[in-house]
Amino acid sequence: MNDTTAKTLNCSPASRDGFPETLGDFGRTRVDLPVVLVAGPTGVGKTAFAVELARALGSEIVNADSMQVYRHMDIGTAKPTPRERSAVPHHLIDIVDPDEPFDAGDYLARARPVIATLHEAGKVPIVVGGTGLYLKVLTRGICAGAPGDPDVRRRLIEEELTLGLPALHERLRDVDPPLGARIHPNDRQRILRALEVFHHSGKPLSYWQRQHRFEDAPYRTLKIFLHRPREVLYARINDRVDAMMAQGFLDEVRNLLAMGCGPELKPMQSLGYRQMARHLRGEMSLDEAVNEIRRDTRRYAKRQLTWFRADPEYRWFDAADTHGLVARIVRETPDLHDNRLR
């Protein structure tokens, strides 16, 4: 690595629409192992940008989307197309079946060795996804002390069906006020996880999080967040849902149900799959299911924006000019290519 990259990342909110310094000034740590993180809300265009960047840098992509790890769930998770995956090697896609437990700890255990292998090969890993928790544990470690229990989780899911998610969120606010205030009332997975930890351990998840000491950053990271104007993003989300339906999303869910993937499985409770399964069970019309997917996807995108706004290390860029951004990365970060890691 050359000495021009030794400055510490300094990204203030006012600088998020562009670089306050050169790209070569991204954060250096004790361990000089560069990683590019590409985040953004669902539908913004992360995959296309990451493929273009990986080709320009002669690198490979590491998935950081919590749903793309599952086999047989392709359309609803918007996995990279066969053409994109043939253009650039992708890692951590299709690695577990829908009935296999998989969480942030499992992701960390899988991702770190892949990144190490790419570094050994002289390549800069490009980690891509919108799952903020996966990106966070990759760079900061994980709160491993918070215990969970599958039986408690199943009981909570049953309560959700009878009482509704708002009632569970209100309970969370009672038993864990700090976390209940931070978690959005529609953030189903985090509500269930927090209540699971509380009912199993007798202590709120915020207690376990306070016990965790974040590790020193193991990588030198360039954190890129792609965004678009809200009306543009929402239009892209609506178009994506329409495209999913045209590609056979309903049949994909029907096949998963035929394979024995019931509503109790975490992947089947996710956005899109939950609504299609409810339609197939006769609980809502197809139009109702599609409209709910559109609405909930827009809400999910809004939560993603809120999550990443809280991390000042991400540099925000309009996804409409990804070609220019790739060219700038290549021009201003010479240590990220030309086999400089060898």
Curated annotation (Swiss-Prot):
One of its GO terms (molecular function) is tRNA dimethylallyltransferase activity. It catalyses: adenosine(37) in tRNA + dimethylallyl diphosphate = N(6)-dimethylallyladenosine(37) in tRNA + diphosphate. Residues 65-68, 189-193 are annotated as: Interaction with substrate tRNA. ATP binds at G40, P41, T42, G43, V44, G45, K46, T47. The keyword tRNA processing applies. Its cofactor is Mg(2+). Monomer. This is tRNA dimethylallyltransferase. It comes from Syntrophobacter fumaroxidans (strain DSM 10017 / MPOB). The lineage of its organism: Bacteria, Pseudomonadati, Thermodesulfobacteriota, Syntrophobacteria, Syntrophobacterales. The gene is miaA.
